[in-house]
Amino acid sequence: VLRAELTREEVADPLPALTGNTLVSLEVLHEACAATRERGCAAEVEESAPGVRCVAAVVPCRLPGTDAISCSMPVDQTTDAQARETGEPLAEATTDLAHRLRRAGIR
C-alpha cells in the first residue's frame, strides 16, 4: 500500500517474490498501485504469506505516506466480498487517525 503513494518512476522494481502470488512483473505492480490509489486501500491474496489475505490503507498524514494499517485474514475463512467490505472502513479509520494525529500535533 505504501508503494501506491509513489510515482510510477519511483516504483522502479518489484518486491522480491515471497510466494507464487507475489507481484513480480513491474507492469502488474504499477497496475496494482493505480487500483490501490483508486480504491483508497490495497488488497492482496497470498502475496506475502500462504493462506493469508490482507487489506491495507495508508494513514494520510505525510506525502508520500509512510504509515499504514492492515488487516490480515485467513484465506480459507474469508470471502473476496468480505475482504472488499473490510477496505472501506479501514480507509475511513486511517483517515480518522490522521486527523487525530494532526490535532494532537503528532504529524
Q: Which role fits each region the language model picked out?
A:
Residues 50, 67-107:
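Juxtadomain coupling helices with adjacent low-complexity linkers
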